[in-house]
């Protein structure tokens, strides 16, 4: 039995609070166990140079952590004067994941900015950021449609993400930091509501894994994704 008496195939408690901030068109606080991330979605009427005069839109993401989101204070990257490799990797992952379910052609020449700020970290911050940002994105798109910026909802499907790993020989879903820090294998999986893969990031931290273990990890992640999609569907009222 894991912390909080969780089973090996059980997600942490997930709570998503919509309209968490006053100013963004879309904003949520997502809580996955003790991990807490504020996700916002905002629209700007311009696109990167490579999309000018194309009639198409763009979506990009930024990710950051509060200095005391972890047990020991980390210096802000803005103070250090550069963004670290981990942050770059996570930002690109969030952006790719959301673009995969967004109809960029229907956005017009507008850019959606997704901002994810981790206020408390206990493992799974990048997966929580993707899951929460999707809800903020849908709220933004609903407001765009209401204002006539787009004729239809520029969203194709749900998207969420979850971690799986092997710890002490056991296959676990949705790793907390303590589990992740001693995992033999660590994997992050991003999937659509229809069960299609957007990204699979798997690493043998200590022990290589075979094809059967890989299949089992992907199947376990898929079960977790289905539950996360249900949470998103419920919080959004069942329609996107």
Curated annotation (Swiss-Prot):
Keywords, in A-Z order: Nucleotidyltransferase, RNA-binding, rRNA processing, Transferase, tRNA processing, tRNA-binding
GO biological process, alphabetically ordered: rRNA catabolic process; rRNA processing; tRNA processing
Binding of phosphate, residues: 86, 124-126
Superkingdom: Bacteria
Reactions catalysed: tRNA(n+1) + phosphate = tRNA(n) + a ribonucleoside 5'-diphosphate
Function according to Swiss-Prot or TrEMBL: Phosphorolytic 3'-5' exoribonuclease that plays an important role in tRNA 3'-end maturation. Removes nucleotide residues following the 3'-CCA terminus of tRNAs; can also add nucleotides to the ends of RNA molecules by using nucleoside diphosphates as substrates, but this may not be physiologically important. Probably plays a role in initiation of 16S rRNA degradation (leading to ribosome degradation) during starvation.
Protein name, entry field: Ribonuclease PH
Species in which this protein is naturally found: Syntrophus aciditrophicus (strain SB)
